[in-house]
Amino acid sequence: MSRSVLAVGARPGDLENGCAGTLAAHRAAGDSVTMLVLSCDGADDPGTRRAEAAARALDCLLVWGPEAAERRRRPERRTQGRGTGDRRVRRGQPGESWDGAAIAAIENVLTGVDADVIYVHAPDDPDTERRAAAAATLSAARHSARILHYPGESAARFDPTLFVDITAHLDRKLAVVADPELATATARHLGARARVRYAEAFVPERFVWDVAGTR
């Protein structure tokens, strides 16, 4: 039985670092995977282009959140701040832009792809934007049965209890991350904890196991 997977990231690069190996494993198993990225710095930004290339490499559908979509449609707005005379590059504060509209957008994607597995940042991630992404996703996915949190750049407060063996898919992860050496070391460390060679790790927000299912 194939599954529909939704992975949510605050910014380009988050999903690649946090769970690209697992997404590759899902695709290898025949699951459909949608990568939803909530923010970016415009269509011409290198991070945006890398995210698009990563989605192609992982054979996943990439969807931009409302803020990211607006920035990609109107790249000239990247240099215009929200205050009079302020022309610095500025991403809106999470509280400004990731409100009910963002929650509704996430819920629309979730419903549209009929996702039954959701990956998102940890709600206590040190980065405020990632915490906001987690909060918005948890609100949108309040009726979902399987929600897993992946680690951010700092795993100091991240205590995983669920591991995915990505040994067969590590090369695909390394092809899309900015620091392959760090990604390899992290996957090896997590693999040692999981008693496999390479792994990614997650903290379940909620995980209902369908024992009667084929997977």
Regions found by a protein language model. Give the residues of each.
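The feature marks non-catalytic terminal segments
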Residues: 58, 75-83, 144-215
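Short, surface-exposed loop/turn motifs that are enriched in glycine and acidic residues
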Residues: 95-96, 123-127, 163
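Active-site rim/loop-helix segments in enzyme catalytic domains that contact anionic ligands
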Residues: 1-114, 142, 203, 211
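Short, glycine/charged-enriched secondary-structure capping and boundary segments
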Residues: 21-23, 48-50, 132-135, 161-164
